[in-house]
Amino acid sequence: MQTSLLKPKIIAVESLGENHAKVVMEPFERGYGHTLGNALRRVLLSSMVGYAPTEVTIAGVVHEYSTLDGVQEDVVNLLLNLKGVVFKLHNRDEVTVTLRKEGEGVVTAGDIELAHDCEVINPNHVIAHLSKGGKLDVQIKVEKGRGYVPGNVRRYGDETAKIIGRIVLDASFSPVRRVSYAVESARVEQRTDLDKLVMNIETSGVITPEEAIRQSARILVDQLSVFAALEGTETAAEAPSRAPQIDPILLRPVDDLELTVRSANCLKAENIYYIGDLIQRTENELLKTPNLGRKSLNEIKEVLASRGLTLGMKLENWPPAGLDK
């Protein structure tokens, strides 16, 4: 009787467009498609290293609720557009770049003055529109990081040393934009109970979908290697106690779920501002929310399921220190 587990012998990559690909792996033993697909998907969404703007200083602006003469966008929309610029650094962890432009016209990511070891992946990305006499002078700090880090939980040392006019951004470092997977039936000779894993991956262009899969697999192998070399400790009591790590996706605002306006407003009315707040609520609790019906509940459940989450989950140490409400 065969006791060894099958390993994939066919790995195919099909391009679906720029920075978008479908990766097919088969055959897997029954059940391993979901086991590995879900693990890879969660690592791809939460643990990939990338680059993002983390701080912005705009000449003539003290805070994000300001406006600039001659600039069509207000500062909030300007910051959102800056967050959409995809940077890539070479052999360094942070850099400060400058965006200066004046006169009527469109300001794009290609107008940013870059250092030799920094590049912009999407130079045609629109940042702002200037009218006659308009002027824009922006300093942008770009850092290397992992996952998603809200600005309100980041630490910058002495609070009194903050620079007036410096705006701290929520940073989405992940170069992976979307990931989904499906498990289909596979066949090897007479066996028809095998799995075929199909992964659909879209990246920002900092890395290719194929490289994203490789990196996520290496992360999983590195983490699981600890269990392969498992050894008992002298006393469990001597092990240092650590606070449970919180999945970065739980720190994202519920607005990132892109719910309908009705559903989003109902959640905020119940002081549900973060995904971590939402998943701790049960279906019955949400149905008691005014104006939130079964249709909105099903929408919320589907959006959470697409991210590997469900309602009624339990979280320790929530909310984390420094999380604004």
Swiss-Prot record:
Its EC number is 2.7.7.6. Residues 246-325 are annotated as: Alpha C-terminal domain (alpha-CTD). It catalyses: RNA(n) + a ribonucleoside 5'-triphosphate = RNA(n+1) + diphosphate. Keywords: DNA-directed RNA polymerase, Nucleotidyltransferase, Transcription, Transferase. SUPFAM superfamilies: C-terminal domain of RNA polymerase alpha subunit, Insert subdomain of RNA polymerase alpha subunit, RBP11-like subunits of RNA polymerase. Residues 1-231 are annotated as: Alpha N-terminal domain (alpha-NTD). Pfam families: RNA_pol_A_bac (PF01000), RNA_pol_A_CTD (PF03118), RNA_pol_L (PF01193). Coiled coil: none annotated. Disulfide bonds: none annotated. Belongs to the RNA polymerase alpha chain family. Homodimer. The RNAP catalytic core consists of 2 alpha, 1 beta, 1 beta' and 1 omega subunit. When a sigma factor is associated with the core the holoenzyme is formed, which can initiate transcription. The N-terminal domain is essential for RNAP assembly and basal transcription, whereas the C-terminal domain is involved in interaction with transcriptional regulators and with upstream promoter elements. This is DNA-directed RNA polymerase subunit alpha. It comes from Burkholderia thailandensis (strain ATCC 700388 / DSM 13276 / CCUG 48851 / CIP 106301 / E264).
